């Protein structure tokens, strides 16, 4: 009796397996095979031959490029925005010339692709890919930061500056102590969005052989014949952007609390 029941169970199991196979249902064996292949591919593109070190080096290059370019962009942006602000009401030839030069800079940089600017910086101005990247990304970001800051300054009520001057403050002190602190609160979201965009724009640094995160991931993809490194790079970029967004929201909350306080 037991033998007959066991044989019947085997027949039912085989019939169910054939039915699942015919209907396209995944089997446990296929699941474990797929999982094993996935883990094997992950090992091949991360641990094998210490490739995780290459990801870290590429990540370090990406962060360094973005951080240095961000500093250059902020310096250029503040300078250009202040020049355009002060030169707007001046009638002298010198101020008009400087204002026109700043306007041309913003128009040209914003109107041409970053890849073209990067190639020009590498082939004409610099011999090293790192220096060319920092310069190109910084100059590119400066044009956008300048417009963001200029818009923030313009959003402040002119009466604020007049009140500062009525208190005996110089034009520079009024800008530094009254206008700019209020403008920063208004432009903070747009400024952080520009920094996030700058971080992602560094992914084209590989055009001039800079081994950033994207370039390293693509190199490993070519060696391992596997597209997983590109997904790993995408996940790392996503984590960086999420982190920057969290910092932005925290700063906005603190500024809001200081306003209420």
Question: Residue spans of the language-model regions?
Answer:
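Intrinsically disordered, low-complexity segments enriched in serine/proline and basic residues
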Residues: 1-10, 14
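Short, Lys/Arg-enriched N-terminal segments with co-localized hydrophobic residues
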Residues: 11-27
């Amino acid at each position: 009796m037991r033998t007959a029941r066991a044989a019947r169970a085997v027949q039912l199991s085989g019939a169910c397996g054939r039915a699942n196979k015919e209907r396209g249902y995944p089997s446990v064996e296929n699941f474990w095979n797929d999982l094993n292949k996935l883990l094997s591919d992950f090992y091949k593109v991360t641990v094998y031959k210490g490739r995780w070190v290459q990801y870290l080096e590429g990540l370090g290059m990406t962060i360094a490029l973005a951080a240095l370019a961000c500093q250059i962009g902020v310096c250029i942006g503040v300078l250009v925005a202040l020049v355009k602000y002060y030169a707007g009401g001046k009638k002298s030839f010198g101020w008009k010339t400087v204002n026109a030069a700043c306007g041309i800079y913003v128009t040209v940089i914003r109107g041409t692709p970053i890849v073209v600017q990067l190639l020009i910086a590498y082939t004409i101005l610099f011999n090293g890919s790192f220096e060319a990247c920092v310069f190109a990304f910084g100059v590119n970001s400066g044009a956008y930061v300048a417009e963001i800051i200029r818009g923030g300054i313009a959003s402040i009520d002119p009466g604020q500056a007049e009140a500062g001057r009525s208190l005996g403050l110089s034009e520079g002190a009024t800008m530094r102590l009254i206008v700019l602190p209020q403008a920063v609160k208004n432009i903070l979201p747009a400024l952080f969005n520009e920094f996030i965009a700058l971080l992602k724009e560094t992914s084209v640094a590989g055009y001039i052989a800079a081994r950033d995160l994207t370039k390293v991931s693509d190199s490993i993809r070519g060696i391992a014949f596997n597209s997983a490194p590109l997904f790993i790079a995408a996940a790392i970029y996503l984590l960086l952007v999420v982190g920057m967004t969290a910092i932005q929201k925290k700063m906005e909350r603190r500024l809001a609390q200081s306003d209420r306080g």
